[in-house]
UniProtKB/Swiss-Prot annotation:
Gene3D superfamilies: HUPs. InterPro entries: QueC, Rossmann-like_a/b/a_fold. Binds 1 zinc ion per subunit. Pathway: Purine metabolism; 7-cyano-7-deazaguanine biosynthesis. The keyword Lipid metabolism does not apply. Pfam families: QueC (PF06508). Its EC number is 6.3.4.20. The keyword Metal-binding applies. It is an enzyme of class 6 (ligase). This is 7-cyano-7-deazaguanine synthase. The lineage of its organism: Bacteria, Pseudomonadati, Pseudomonadota, Gammaproteobacteria, Oceanospirillales.
Length: 251
């Protein structure tokens, strides 16, 4: 059993949107978006574009077992004609590499996306590291807002996706440089299903995303990340446009 603390997504009140406001009167026209190539950050990317920001997307190679998400992110940004950098920080792999996402000798957990099953996929301090680099880039290019794709379904498993983490990082980002930077996580209180619903309402094509923890030609359909994605599509009554190899997934 995992000894991770139990957190649940915040309960939504009647009439309350799961998508939080992403603009502030103090925002500049430029924004940095941490973009992995997955469906959460893909939806955040388009939310920022719809809000009128000049988006500068950052993707990070931190020693992941495969680069399918990064390739997907590159293709999407090229298609959209937006600034995009893939930042190679694999030098830190020896410091934070004890995760099934970064260590090919570890078994990737199958099954449901929950704390007990998915604890092996935690990369220590990942979002703090990536946000710190994104904040520095924002200051460098004259942006004062950084977006990332934390969502309510990750609160149980990933401490750096929880509301209290975002709140504290905002406090630090406001004083870490002469230029305050705001961290925005528009889906912080949303489920994967709600993120998908928002993206579908924007007309997004989720064939342009990669979710699977494995880097095969087709998504496996049985890792925790695939199962969460498939459940979101099923809940929306929509067929996932990706072609899956795993048993129980759509062909």
């Amino acid at each position: 059993m995992s000894d991770l603390p139990r957190h649940s997504p915040r309960r939504q009140h009647a009439g309350e949107s799961a998508v939080t406001a992403i603009t502030s009167p103090e925002d500049t026209t430029k924004a940095v978006v941490i973009y992995s190539g997955g469906m959460d950050s893909y939806t955040v990317l388009h939310r920022a574009l719809r809000a009128g920001f000049e988006v500068h997307a950052l993707s990070f190679h931190y020693g992941q077992r495969h680069s399918r998400e990064l390739e997907t992110a590159h293709d999407v940004c090229q298609r959209l004609g937006i600034a995009h950098q893939v930042v190679d920080i694999r030098a830190i792999h020896g410091l934070i590499g004890n995760s099934a996402l970064t260590d090919a000798t570890q078994t990737m957990p199958d099954g449901d996306y929950d704390a007990d099953n998915m604890a092996a996929t935690v990369v220590p301090n990942r979002n703090m590291i990536l946000l710190s680099l994104a904040i520095g880039h924002a200051v460098n290019i004259g942006a004062n807002v950084c977006f990332y794709g934390a969502h309510g379904g990750d609160h149980v498993l990933y401490p750096d996706c929880r509301p209290e983490f975002v709140e504290r990082m905002n406090d630090v980002a406001a004083i870490a440089d002469f230029t305050p930077v705001r961290i925005a996580a528009p889906y912080l209180h949303a489920s994967k299903e709600e993120i998908l619903a928002d993206g579908l309402a924007m007309g997004l094509d989720y064939a342009q995303t990669w979710t699977c923890y494995l880097g095969a030609e087709r998504s496996c359909g049985h890792c925790g990340s695939c199962r969460e994605r498939l459940a979101a599509f099923a809940a929306q009554g929509v067929t996932d446009p990706l072609v899956y190899a795993g048993a129980g997934a759509s062909d």
